[in-house]
Every structure is written in C-alpha cells, then in structure tokens.
C-alpha cells in the first residue's frame, strides 16, 4: 500500500523546490486548481500552467502538455496534478518517461498503484494532499 512521505519530508521538499507545473490548471478564477496555483505563486513558486485550452494563465504561458512544458519552460521541480484519478496512470507513465523529479497528486486524486509505480521509479510522490494547504501549514 502506498504511503505518502512524512510531514518533515514534504516540508523539506516544499522548501527546496521553485518551479511547479500545474497539470489541469483552470483559467477560471475560483476553480480549485486556479486558486491553489495563485496561492503557490504568493509563496514565491513559479507556476508553469499545463492546459491546452488556454494560451496564458496567472500571467504565465500555458503549455498544451507536460512534455512541451518541460522542453519550453525550463527545469520543472514538480508536477502538481489536478486531473481525475483515471488519468493518473498515464500521467505517471509520462512523468517516468520525461524523468520528472516529483509528482504531487492533489486532494481526491488517488491511484495507489500509479503512485507506487512513480515512487518505485525514483520520483518523489505525494498523493491525495493539497500542495497549497501543506505549504500554508508550514508558515512563512
């Protein structure tokens, strides 16, 4: 059974990273993915939107897919996933192929087998946790 990293491991990770690709980032203010990405920007993270339907979100160029984002936006530290659970296995396979260093599956995005596969491939993996809430709980 997949287990998330410990709280200290997640906190150390969030202190270390700088660039977050948000897969499934909505251009619509008020949507959870938009709110989380906006709040992560306030913490100083660079957001790389991945949404084929929007040219720009939150002042950043949006990319149609993860591969083009990784090639065009420069190094990405983590992929924050706002997609339905049935898409996670495919996302993890792509993350492994692209050598993504970390995958963070937001609240409600649960696929234990895919999360374990990512971890087994050496990818720092968090499942069913909100990156923003975890970062906010750390304080300044």
Spans of model-derived segments:
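Glycine-rich, highly charged phosphate/nucleotide-binding loops
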Residues: 1-6, 57-89
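NAD(P)-binding Rossmann-fold cofactor-contacting core
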Residues: 23-31, 38-58
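A short helix->loop->beta-strand "cap" motif at the edges of active sites that frequently abuts
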Residues: 43-45, 98-103, 121-123
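Short internal beta-strands
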Residues: 48-51, 103-107
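Rossmann-fold NAD(P) dinucleotide-binding segment
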Residues: 87-104
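Rossmann-fold NAD(P)-binding glycine/threonine-rich loop
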Residues: 107-135
């Amino acid at each position: 059974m997949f287990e998330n990293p410990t709280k200290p491991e997640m906190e150390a990770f969030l202190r270390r990273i700088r660039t977050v690709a948000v897969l499934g980032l909505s251009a619509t203010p008020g949507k959870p993915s938009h709110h989380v990405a906006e709040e992560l920007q306030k913490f100083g993270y660079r957001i790389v939107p991945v949404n084929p339907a929007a040219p720009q979100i939150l002042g950043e160029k949006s990319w149609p897919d993860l591969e083009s984002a990784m090639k065009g936006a420069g190094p990405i530290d983590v992929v924050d996933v706002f997609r339905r659970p049935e898409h996670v296995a495919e996302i993890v396979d792509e993350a492994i192929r692209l050598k993504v260093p970390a995958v963070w599956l937001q609240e409600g995005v649960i696929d234990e087998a895919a999360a374990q596969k990512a971890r087994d491939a050496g990818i720092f993996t968090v499942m069913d946790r909100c990156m923003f809430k975890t970062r906010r709980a750390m304080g300044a």
